[in-house]
């Protein structure tokens, strides 16, 4: 993925990147009511078609981090992370926002929206396998 190198001290999960514009449109239609229509100046225009598919096996995690943004050639830029939890049947693997004191327990089919600048982590999976799909909400160029 274009010079991207995972640091095992930060994350040791597995990841596949796919581009799926039709899936992005369908996903956005399902979550649009929960998306802030504007953040400062720009307005929401849809979901990012670049999906990151994550698999976490026992012992795998994603340490505290901020999510990076995605920018299109048009100047549209992601401001929100859109995480969809794909399964249950594992222990651990919560999404933790330490500064906010919030712990999100993954539930199959549920989505989590949050601003990229919020420090968070994917806690260690203790048993079973966790699957999640990450996209972003794209906003118009400023």
Predicted segments — roles?
Residues 1-111, 117-142:
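Fe(II)/2-oxoglutarate oxygenase catalytic core
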